[in-house]
Amino acid sequence: HSTMRTRYFFAILLLVPVVYFNVKAQGLPDLGEASQSAFTPAMERQLGQSIMKEARADPSFYDDPEITDYVAGVGNRLAARGADTRQSFEFFMMRDTQINAFAMPGGKIGVHTGLITAAQSESEMAGVLGHEIAHVTQRHIARMVSNQQANQWVSLAAFAIALLAARSNSQVSQAAIAAGPALAVQQQLNYSRDFEREADRMGLQMLEKAGFDPRGMELFFERLQRATRLVEGGAPSYLRSHPLTYERIADMQGRAANLPYKQVADPIE
């Protein structure tokens, strides 16, 4: 079934913020050279193109040129100030009321319509986009893959099943999450807090350099945390895709406070 296959691929993409990788997050780390041999940029591009074919065939793919061009304009403005200006990006929309965005291999960035609705300023939306762009420029997917063992693709499939189950209430999904391989997945679905902090900090730099209000990131995080607090409190920790912690918000507040203040008029279009 096309829709199910697409969700399967999207579940894999959510691995970026949730798979554990033991990297040091003291300051702003360098691009991971170890990732180059395990999962090359060419492999990332090929995988990204394959997944995009599935995305475009999904009924929730939101083909609105005006909105897509607007989001792409903001995203490319940020990417031009990123860590890897050679990386090209493609931004696309998914019709989904959930507040979310996600990074895919090869510089593909998916944005839910719910994110656009929830953002109260252009800088808030840009803060989320900058975070996802940083996942790509810092090669988090490649660094995750390089940390897997010989059965890495089997592990990815198990992760996908577990995350797919999180988005469905079907008995089949519940059975999948209870299966032996998925139970092992639970132990690995610890948040990569280092990846998230890294993406926050790189995203904040892009936000400031591109002329947005750097406080947009922390303000949106705060609102998102308030909106999801009840859901997070009742969900198994291994099914949460982003660790929205007070620590992350405090870190962003501290870093933004040290940047020169500038007034930005940025109503979202």
Can you say where each PLM-predicted feature lies in the sequence?
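Active-site recognition of the HExxH zinc-binding catalytic motif
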Residues: 111, 127-135, 139, 199
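Membrane-active amphipathic alpha-helices enriched in small hydrophobic residues
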Residues: 153-168, 175-185
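Hydrophobic or amphipathic, alpha-helical segments that drive membrane association/targeting
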Residues: 3-102, 184-185, 227-232
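Surface-exposed patches in mature extracellular/periplasmic domains of secreted proteins
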Residues: 58-69, 81-91, 141-149, 171-175, ...
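Short pre-active-site segment immediately N-terminal to the catalytic Zn-binding motif
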Residues: 110-127
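Extracytoplasmic and endomembrane cell-envelope/extracellular-matrix remodeling and assembly machinery
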Residues: 31-38, 61, 69, 182-269
